C-alpha cells in the first residue's frame, strides 16, 4: 500500500513540474525535461525518507494523497506559475505533516516496546529473586553440613555475592527502570562487556514520566551496549549520575569499533542517523534528543577513538 502512495507521489510531482515548465516556456521539450527532473527529485526524496514512510500509517497516507490529487487539479485551472507554486507549497506542507506524524508514531511505538520490555525484565528480576529465596534453605543445609571452616566461608561469600551482585545498583529505582537496568547488566555480562556504574542519584529521579524514563535510559544503555559489544579493543561501559547546581547530570562512556564522520556530524540532530553499524534507523538517538530538548536540557557528546562519551544535563527540582 505504501509503495502505491509513493508511485502516486512521484507521478503527481512530475506532472506539477511538467505544468510549471509549460507555463514558463511553452515548449514541449522543456516540459518533458522538467517532468523527468521532477521525477528524479521525487525519487531521491522518497529514497532519503524511506525510513519515515515505513512508520507512516496507511490512513494518513490516504488523506494526504487525496489532498495532493485535489491540489494538482488547481494546476489545470490556470496557465501561469502561481497555481504551480501554490501546489508545491501544499505538497511541502503535506510532507512536513507526514514526516512529523511518522516520527511521532515511531517514538510512541518505541516507547510502548520499551515499556513492554521493561515490564518483562522486571518480572524476570522478580522471578530471579524468588528463585534465590527458594534456594535459601538448601544453602543453609549445605553450610550446616560443611566441615572445613575455610570451605564454609568461601561458600557464604559466594552466596552473598549472588544476592548483592546488582542490589546496590537497583536500590532506589522504580520497577520499570530497575527492570531495564537488570536486563542491561545481564546482557553486558553475557557479551563480556565490563560495566562500571556510579549511581550517585537514582535514574528514577530523572524529571520525566516513568514511560519517558524507560525510553531515555533504555535507549542510552542499548546504544552503549551494542557499540561496546562490537569494539575490537577492551569492551567497557561507564555510567554515572549526579546532581550539580540544580542539574541532573547523566554521563555514559562506551568503547566503540569506530564511527563514520558523516554520522557524527548529524547524530542526535536528525532522524535516520545511527551510531550502530548495519541497517539501523537512529530512532534511539532521535528519541533521546527529543526527550532532553523537551525537558529544556542539554546534550553533548565527544568521540575520541575508541571512546564515545555522552553527557546529558537536565534542570532538576526536588
UniProtKB/Swiss-Prot annotation:
Keyword annotations: ATP-binding, Cell membrane, Kinase, Membrane, Nucleotide-binding, Phosphoprotein, Transferase, Transmembrane, Transmembrane helix, Two-component regulatory system
Cell compartment(s), UniProt: Cell membrane
Database matches in Gene3D superfamilies: Histidine kinase-like ATPase, C-terminal domain (3.30.565.10)
Enzyme superclass (EC): transferase
Protein name per its UniProtKB record: Sensor histidine kinase NatK
Primary localisation category: membrane
Biological-process GO terms, alphabetical: phosphorelay signal transduction system
One GO cellular component term noted in the UniProt record for this chain: plasma membrane
Keyword Transcription regulation assigned: no
TM regions (residue ranges): 4-24, 27-47, 72-82
Amino acid at each position: 500500500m505504501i509503495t502505491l502512495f509513493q508511485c502516486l507521489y512521484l507521478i503527481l510531482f512530475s506532472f506539477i513540474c511538467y505544468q510549471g515548465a509549460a507555463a514558463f516556456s511553452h515548449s514541449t521539450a522543456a516540459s518533458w525535461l522538467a517532468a523527468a527532473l521532477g521525477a528524479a527529485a521525487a525519487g531521491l526524496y522518497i529514497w532519503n525518507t524511506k525510513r519515515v514512510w515505513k512508520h507512516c500509517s496507511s490512513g494518513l497516507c490516504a488523506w494526504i494523497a487525496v489532498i495532493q490529487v485535489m491540489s494538482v487539479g488547481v494546476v489545470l485551472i490556470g496557465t501561469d506559475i502561481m497555481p504551480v507554486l501554490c501546489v508545491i507549497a501544499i505538497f511541502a506542507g503535506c510532507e512536513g505533516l507526514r514526516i512529523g506524524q511518522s516520527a511521532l508514531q515511531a517514538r510512541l511505538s518505541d516507547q510502548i516496546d520499551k515499556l513492554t520490555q521493561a515490564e518483562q525484565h522486571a518480572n524476570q528480576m522478580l522471578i530471579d529473586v524468588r528463585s534465590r529465596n527458594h534456594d535459601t534453605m538448601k544453602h543453609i543445609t549445605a553450610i550446616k553440613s560443611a566441615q572445613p571452616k575455610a570451605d564454609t566461608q568461601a561458600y557464604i561469600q559466594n552466596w552473598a555475592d549472588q544476592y548483592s551482585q546488582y542490589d546496590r545498583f537497583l536500590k532506589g529505582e522504580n520497577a520499570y527502570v530497575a527492570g531495564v537496568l537488570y536486563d542491561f547488566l545481564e546482557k553486558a555480562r553475557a557479551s563480556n562487556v565490563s560495566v562500571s556504574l556510579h549511581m550517585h542519584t537514582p535514574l528514577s529521579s530523572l524529571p520525566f514520566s516513568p514511560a519517558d524514563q524507560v525510553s531515555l535510559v533504555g535507549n542510552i544503555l542499548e546504544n552503549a551496549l551494542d557499540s561496546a559489544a562490537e569494539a575490537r579493543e577492551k569492551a567497557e561501559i561507564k555510567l554515572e549520575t549526579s546532581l550539580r547546581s540544580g542539574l541532573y547530570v547523566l554521563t555514559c562512556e562506551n568503547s566503540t569499533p569506530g564511527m563514520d564522520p558523516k554520522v557524527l556530524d548529524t547524530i542526535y540532530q536528525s532522524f535516520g542517523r545511527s551510531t550502530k553499524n548495519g541497517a539501523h534507523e537512529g530512532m534511539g538517538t532521535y528519541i533521546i534528543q527529543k526527550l532532553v530538548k523537551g525537558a529544556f536540557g542539554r546534550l553533548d557528546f565527544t568521540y575520541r577513538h575508541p571512546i564515545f562519551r555522552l553527557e546529558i544535563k537536565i534542570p532538576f527540582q526536588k
